């Protein structure tokens, strides 16, 4: 039986009743839907680097997104300062540092200052990770989510994500207040991240 100790970087946490690691977008949605339909506690995790879990059994479902594809979507028209914006999409389960390396190798700027932060792409926008005065919010175009309340996928824009210091509308939706929108979802938010689209630009150094 899988335990949280197997999934967290700190190596502690009790056994998990059901552990799922879907490899498709549909699989992620179905795993979440199944847990919600049965009224089971649901915990969707990323890299397990920001978790301290009790050693008592977790009688619910833990989902870890095993998808990690990254793709360049397009190149938009030049913005006002003359730079060309490049849209890059990454699936939620992609390791954050692997994503940063991918972008740097393509000569793209916007997330390189956040290299070395543990976790996944999906978790990065929930937490609005940051370092050295930079936050992931500054490079996010939109986030595709599964809305557990309305049972549908949804595209949330940067503005709709209400990013703040280590906070987002995604994270806030775990709590009854002061969530935007308010909902009782815990320990996983109302919105489960499926993929993130970033707006990056070409590096001047190539």
Over which residues does each language-model region extend?
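Anion-binding (especially nucleotide phosphate/pyrophosphate-binding) glycine-rich loop
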Residues: 1-149
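FAD-binding subdomain of flavoenzyme oxidoreductases
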Residues: 113-114, 124-206
């Amino acid at each position: 039986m899988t335990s949280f100790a197997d999934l967290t970087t700190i190596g502690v946490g009790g056994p998990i009743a059901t552990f799922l690691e879907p490899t498709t977008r549909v699989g992620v949605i179905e795993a979440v839907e199944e847990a919600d339909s049965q009224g089971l506690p649901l915990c969707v995790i990323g890299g397990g680097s920001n978790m301290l879990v009790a050693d008592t059994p977790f009688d619910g479902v833990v989902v870890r997104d095993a998808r990690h594809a990254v793709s360049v979507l397009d190149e938009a028209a030049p913005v006002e300062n003359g730079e060309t914006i490049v849209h890059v999409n990454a699936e939620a389960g992609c390791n954050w540092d692997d994503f940063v390396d991918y972008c740097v190798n393509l000569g793209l700027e916007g997330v390189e200052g956040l290299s070395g932060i543990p976790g996944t792409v999906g978790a990065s926008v929930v937490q609005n990770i940051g370092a050295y005065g930079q936050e992931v919010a500054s490079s996010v175009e939109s986030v595709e989510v599964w809305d557990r309340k309305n049972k549908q996928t949804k595209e949330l824009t940067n503005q709709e994500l209400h990013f703040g210091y280590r906070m987002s509308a995604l994270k806030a939706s775990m709590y009854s207040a002061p969530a935007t929108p308010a909902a009782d979802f815990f320990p996983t938010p109302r919105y489960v991240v499926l993929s993130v689209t970033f707006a990056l630009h070409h590096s001047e150094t190539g």
